[in-house]
């Protein structure tokens, strides 16, 4: 549609996150369902800092989602790259991370274009 190239618009997207495995991840999942992303991210950070392997990978993945919601795409990519380094090669988690990376890069590109378009209205 041509109008989408002229005016900014909202597009609803679906994102996945991990919410099991330990108490902090389960509690963070509750916070997400309550739309309390700050509290969820604090718990994910704690899991990320004190765990290794799959738990750390899942927390990094979730932190990437948090930073995407905050429009901090550079930080989101950092955490997603970290999650990818911890995921088993060829695992379903690695595939999910790869798919999310493509989505994140596309969203970052659209966001930069929107920022460029909106600069026209700055004094």
Language-model features, listed with the residues they occupy:
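C-terminal/domain-edge helix-coil "capping" segments
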Residues: 1-59, 63-71, 82, 86-90, ...
């Amino acid at each position: 549609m041509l109008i989408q190239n002229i005016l900014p618009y909202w597009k609803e997207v679906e994102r996945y996150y991990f919410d099991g495995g330990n108490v902090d991840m389960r509690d963070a999942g509750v916070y997400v369902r309550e739309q309390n992303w700050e509290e969820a991210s604090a718990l994910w950070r704690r899991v990320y800092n004190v765990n290794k392997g799959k738990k750390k990978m899942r927390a990094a993945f979730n932190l990437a989602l948090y930073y995407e919601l905050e429009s901090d795409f550079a930080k989101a990519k950092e955490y997603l790259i970290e999650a990818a380094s911890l995921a088993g090669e060829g695992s379903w988690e690695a595939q999910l991370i790869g798919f999310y990376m493509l989505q994140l890069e596309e969203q970052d590109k659209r966001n930069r274009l929107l920022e460029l378009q909106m600069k026209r209205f700055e004094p």
